[in-house]
């Protein structure tokens, strides 16, 4: 996960829409190297026409007494008069003596966009004598993205209020005349307040939804040829393509390319997703034999794959999804030092996979389960002395599930815990459960990709996202798996340490991201390694 933070100067004058002057942008808590007017995408839930804020008693809502939670307080519960996915259900906590709203809790579900549901907590305070307004807002959201369903938290804090200041107009004029980024908060949501050629500013009709970045990526993987590769790349993303709520993400780096798209309610009530990727760098896959990584029987592999998925929210955080994937594997001779003379390569070709998945996400708790079935090309591979056949004519199955928890221990300090199990049937060396590499069934940091071939994997992970300051954001995870090897049916333990860090941008770059894994323990000799990437990004 990650977070995007902003610091604004907020200008509000009676009878006018509020204006915000962007002072700072933080990627994962680290200050980004941005100057001038740089507009990042705005992702918000659909706005409601009428909000039950501060006891406005809007006619679209029905109100009822919720009793006294503590002496001197009263709960006022509200719900929409008629069904409306954009309307809120919730409660206001009111001070009985003054009639002031102290706290507001509200939520919406089944929203028709990227944000599928949200739960908000608004805290009110007296910012000046007789002036009562929100001072803090926390929002918990469920998004449908190109990578699936994810949980997002927003936190807004208002402080250092200056009311009826003598220099308000001068400060506002200075903000408008500056070259910095500004926004206006309109009834339809936040819109960029763009500087024009004559020095004036204009409200953009639509919310900014797209962005681009140039990337310099260094890949580290001992299975690649070469094991360290520096790649230039271009990133493009849009959260409202064609104005229809379509999400698009794409990365092209020459030898590695990936793209994905998601269309909320793209087919009736079903969310549609699609993705494609291709790796043109050859990896050399070496088998595990008798509990250690072999220096023989190495096979080179390149691949490309596409996938299509359908999903539907069932309410209360439950969701069901189905997808189909097509992957083309091109096998060739591996690195020279790992080749075995006379080794027959496995059959290249198309592998088809269908998967059904159910999930539940609620207030940081996560549960997932899946069942998949597929077919790969038939054939044989190996040496004359030890020939191997693709089992069951290429038909195979896989299944598994996991439980997880994300919890903010204190502001900015996040805990993640996860445990799960994955299994299957009719696997072989070139179609099995892997625990290394980004595309593996279970990813354990610091384990070589496509080295361990297993038919059962049980795993557990724990991690902390540590707010170390504006110049560093550090996430550390400890990961362990117990795998049953196809080679001999024995179970082996593997452990790795993941380290993800964000650093402030420098020179021409906006931000720096480091994601590396180090293998710290393995019952299988030779499969631990240093792997991951370092990315330098320039947003424009």
Where do the model's predicted regions map?
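C-terminal outer-membrane beta-barrel translocator/porin domains of Gram-negative envelope proteins
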Residues: 28-61, 73, 195-218, 341-490, ...
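Outer-membrane beta-barrel translocator/channel fold
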Residues: 142-152, 272-313, 328-341, 512-534
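Outer-membrane beta-barrel initiation region
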Residues: 147-275, 280-286, 313-321, 349-362, ...
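Short, hydrophobic/aromatic-rich segments at coil-to-beta transitions
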Residues: 70-77, 100-105, 131-138, 212-213, ...
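Extended lipid/amphipathic-ligand handling interfaces
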Residues: 8-10, 120-129, 263
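Structured extracytoplasmic
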Residues: 1-89, 97-100, 110-118, 142-197
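Transmembrane beta-strands of outer-membrane beta-barrel proteins
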Residues: 104-107, 137-138, 217-219, 249-253, ...
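A short, structured loop/turn motif at beta-sheet edges
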Residues: 64-72, 94-100, 123-133, 467-469
């Amino acid at each position: 996960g990650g977070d995007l933070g902003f610091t604004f100067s907020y200008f509000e004058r009676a009878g006018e829409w509020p204006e915000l002057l962007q002072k700072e942008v933080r990627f994962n808590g680290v200050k980004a190297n941005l100057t001038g007017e740089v507009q990042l995408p705005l992702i918000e839930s659909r706005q409601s026409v009428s909000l039950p804020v501060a006891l406005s008693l809007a006619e679209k809502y029905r109100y009822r007494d919720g009793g006294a939670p503590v002496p001197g307080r009263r709960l006022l519960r509200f719900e929409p008069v008629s069904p409306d996915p954009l309307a809120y259900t919730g409660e206001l906590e009111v001070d009985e003596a003054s009639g002031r709203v102290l706290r507001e809790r509200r939520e919406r579900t089944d929203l028709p966009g990227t944000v599928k549901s949200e739960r908000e907590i608004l805290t009110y305070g007296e910012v000046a004598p007789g002036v009562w307004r929100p001072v803090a807002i926390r929002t918990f959201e469920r998004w449908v993205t190109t990578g699936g369903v994810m949980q997002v938290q927003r936190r807004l804090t208002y402080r250092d209020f200056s009311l009826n200041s003598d220099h308000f107009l001068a400060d506002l004029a200075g903000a408008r005349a500056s070259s910095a980024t500004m926004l206006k908060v309109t009834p339809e949501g936040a819109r960029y307040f763009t500087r024009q050629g004559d020095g004036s500013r204009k409200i953009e009709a639509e919310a900014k939804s797209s962005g681009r970045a140039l990337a310099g990526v260094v890949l580290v993987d001992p299975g690649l040829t070469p094991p360290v590769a520096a790649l230039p790349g271009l990133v493009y993303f849009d959260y409202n393509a064609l104005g229809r709520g379509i999400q698009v993400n794409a990365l092209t780096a020459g030898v590695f390319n990936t793209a994905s798209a998601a269309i909320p309610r793209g087919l009736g009530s079903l969310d549609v997703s699609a993705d494609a990727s291709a790796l043109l760098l050859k990896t050399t896959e070496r088998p595990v034999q008798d509990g250690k990584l072999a220096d023989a029987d190495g096979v080179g592999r390149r691949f490309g794959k596409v996938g299509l998925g359908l999903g539907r929210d069932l309410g209360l955080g439950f969701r069901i999804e189905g997808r189909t994937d097509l992957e083309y594997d091109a096998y060739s001779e591996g690195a020279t030092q790992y080749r075995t003379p006379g080794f027959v390569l496995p059959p290249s070709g198309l592998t088809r996979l269908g998967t059904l998945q159910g999930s539940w996400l609620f207030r940081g708790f996560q549960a997932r389960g899946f069942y998949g079935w597929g077919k790969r090309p038939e054939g044989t591979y190996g040496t004359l002395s030890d020939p191997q056949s693709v089992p069951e004519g290429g038909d195979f199955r896989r299944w598994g599930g996991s439980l997880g928890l994300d919890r903010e221990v204190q502001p900015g300090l996040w805990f993640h815990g996860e445990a799960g199990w994955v299994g299957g049937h009719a696997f072989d060396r070139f179609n099995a459960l892997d625990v290394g590499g980004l595309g593996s069934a279970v990813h354990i940091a610091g384990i070589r990709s496509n080295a361990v071939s297993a038919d059962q994997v049980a795993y557990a992970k724990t991690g902390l996202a540590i707010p170390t300051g504006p110049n560093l954001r550090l996430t550390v995870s400890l990961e362990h798996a117990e795998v049953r090897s196809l080679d001999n049916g024995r179970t082996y333990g593997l452990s790795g340490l993941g380290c993800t860090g964000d650093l402030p941008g420098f020179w021409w770059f906006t931000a720096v991201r480091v994601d590396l894994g180090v293998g710290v323990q393995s019952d299988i000799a030779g499969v631990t390694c240093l792997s991951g990437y370092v990315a330098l990004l320039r947003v424009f």
